[in-house]
Structures are given as structure tokens and as C-alpha cells.
Amino acid sequence: MAKQSAKGSTTTKRQRGKRREKKNVPRGQAHIQSTFNNTIVTITDPNGNVVCWSSAGQNGFKGSRKSTPYAAQIAAENAARKAIENGMRQIEVFVKGPGAGREAAIRSLQAAGLQVTAITDVTPIPHNGCRPPKRRRV
């Protein structure tokens, strides 16, 4: 027979972690990582501390639909909405990766009401590093 717990039937409300307070960050950076499979939008303050983030997979897209420009647009809109709630007005955009959602994400950040001050491509280019995946034969 299982032991009875010492607390009995009285239930107490415990707070699960501290509530996230709103940061007031007027300027920031948007890092768009666009791969062949997904698009991740992370919005940070100028020091690189994460304010909010969103991705195509987080917004309910699964499988090959995550890699579409529409999924990247929805992810960027979601991240921009959260950033505006935290008081953000201007952003610099850093784009990384070869994916389909690059331009769509930048456009939807602008459409959501954030002023884009600069767009920089920070895609890493190997100096003959790892062997790339083999070509697909369909």
C-alpha cells in the first residue's frame, strides 16, 4: 500500500517561476536564421540579450510547411508583436542562412511597425570546410 502524503488533501498554490517583466528596449537587433527546413527570428537588445523569439515550428507549421516564406512571415510577425509590446521601435536586421524565408521575414518585420535601420547578411561562408550534402536526384 502506498504511503499517504504528509500534506493531506490541502492544496496550496505555488508560483511556478517568476513572471517575466516587460523590458523597455527602444532599439534592438533582429536575427533571422533561415535554413532549408525552418526559419527562426530572435529579437535582442543592442548587447545581444534575447527580448523575444519565434519560429515557424513554434507557430504550428510542421514538416515541409515550416520552410515556406509564409511560415517565415508569420514567425516574424509574431516576434515583432512581442518586441513592440516590450517597447521596441527600431531594429537592425541580421540575416543568416540560405532559406526561402529571408525576404519574407524582413518584409513582415517592417509591416508590423518596426523601423528597419540596417540589413546585414551574416551567412557563414566556409574556407573549404565541411563536405556539403550530396546532390538530390529526383
Curated annotation (Swiss-Prot):
SUPFAM superfamilies documented for this protein: Translational machinery components
Ranges annotated as biased composition (Basic residues): 13-22
GO CC, any one term: ribosome
Domain of life (superkingdom): Bacteria
InterPro entries: Ribosomal_uS11, Ribosomal_uS11_bac-type, Ribosomal_uS11_CS, Ribosomal_uS11_sf
Gene3D superfamilies: Ribosomal protein S11
Cleaved signal peptide residues: none
Entry keyword Plastid: no
UniProt KW keywords: Ribonucleoprotein, Ribosomal protein, RNA-binding, rRNA-binding
Annotated GO MF terms: rRNA binding; structural constituent of ribosome
Region (Disordered): 1-37
Pfam families documented for this protein: Ribosomal_S11
Family, similarity comment: Belongs to the universal ribosomal protein uS11 family.
HAMAP family the record matches: Ribosomal_uS11
Function: Located on the platform of the 30S subunit, it bridges several disparate RNA helices of the 16S rRNA. Forms part of the Shine-Dalgarno cleft in the 70S ribosome.
Assembly description: Part of the 30S ribosomal subunit. Interacts with proteins S7 and S18. Binds to IF-3.
Name of the protein: Small ribosomal subunit protein uS11
Organism: Roseiflexus castenholzii (strain DSM 13941 / HLO8)
